[in-house]
A protein has these predicted regions:
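Paired small-residue
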Residues: 142, 153-161
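Extracytoplasmic gate region of multi-pass secondary transporters
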Residues: 61-113
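Structural signature of the two symmetry-related core transmembrane helices
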Residues: 130-145
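Intracellular juxtamembrane helix-capping segments at the cytosolic ends
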Residues: 167-181
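A late C-terminal transmembrane helix in Major Facilitator Superfamily
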Residues: 181-216
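Helix-loop-helix hairpin linking two adjacent transmembrane segments in secondary transporters
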Residues: 1-42
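Interfacial helix-cap and linker-helix signal at transmembrane-aqueous boundaries
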Residues: 5-16, 89-90, 122-123, 178, ...
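Multi-pass alpha-helical transporter architecture, strongest
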Residues: 34-41, 223-245
Length: 245
């Protein structure tokens, strides 16, 4: 949310033609993070003497591939809408890019943060898999709202609601993986992060590709990406059955 707000203020003040300057400013953050990490203690995920699962051992487990799929779909479900929210707001509401950025990505980010805040505060009282199931269903509904509701303002509300629905997907999948695969360790979390990043790039790419193939109809692009929350929902149900067995 801060990135969207600060970037919008910067472009409004100095003009979008100075985007390279803003890129350099934002580049300072990962540089500082790298310096901090150099001096930060990193503790092992295993008890002393324990050995985590190897990548080969992880790849031999069916549940690992299920959570990998879930992680990919979590990233794709989130970014398929958030990356196109500004364009959707501009085209649907016929507003400037400044207003589009505030109405689209910022509303999405606020509600996504709210979902994570609520779970962080009340997580001990909430069943994670049930919360993720309802969130996935809400995500599907928001996608359908974006694709089919003819009123631009309501479709934009669907974008914001989508932000709330995807808030738990990424951290929730990490938690499910940790509980389902004992001894997964660093290798597991690294591969899950890779899967999530692939989803973050694949979701918007699919939406954009489908949109351009049907006459730049962004609604149809978003509709095509509905496959991701549906697959995530299926993955959650598989994890539930696996836990019972």
């Amino acid at each position: 949310m801060g990135v969207v707000l600060i970037s919008t203020i910067f472009f409004s003040t100095f003009g979008i033609e100075n985007w390279k300057i803003l890129a350099r400013i934002w580049a300072v953050i990962p540089v500082l993070n790298g310096i901090v990490f150099l001096t930060s203690p990193i503790y092992s995920l295993h008890e002393e003497g324990e050995k985590g699962l190897s990548i080969r051992e992880l790849c031999s487990m069916k549940i690992f591939w299920v959570v990998m799929l879930m992680m990919t779909c979590a990233g794709a479900s989130e970014q398929a809408v958030s990356q196109w929210a500004s364009t959707f707001a501009e085209e649907g509401l016929k507003v400037s890019k400044t207003v589009g950025d505030l109405a689209g990505p910022m509303a999405f980010a606020v509600l996504m943060g709210l979902a994570r805040l609520l779970y962080g505060k009340y997580g001990e009282k909430i069943d994670l898999k049930r919360f993720m199931t309802y969130s996935s269903i809400l995500c599907v509904i928001s996608y359908l709202c974006i694709a089919f509701v003819p009123v631009p303002m309501l479709s934009l509300v669907g974008c914001a609601v989508c932000g709330f629905s995807v808030g738990i997907m990424w951290p929730g999948t990490f938690s499910i993986a940790s509980a389902s695969i004992r001894g997964g360790g660093t290798a597991m979390f690294a591969l899950l992060a890779l899967a999530g990043d692939l989803g973050c790039s694949g979701g918007p790419t699919l939406a954009g590709f489908v949109s351009s193939s049907v006459g730049n109809n962004l609604r149809m692009g978003i509709l095509a990406a509905i496959v991701f929350p549906v697959l995530l929902l299926i993955g959650i149900q598989i994890c539930k059955k696996s836990q019972k067995n």
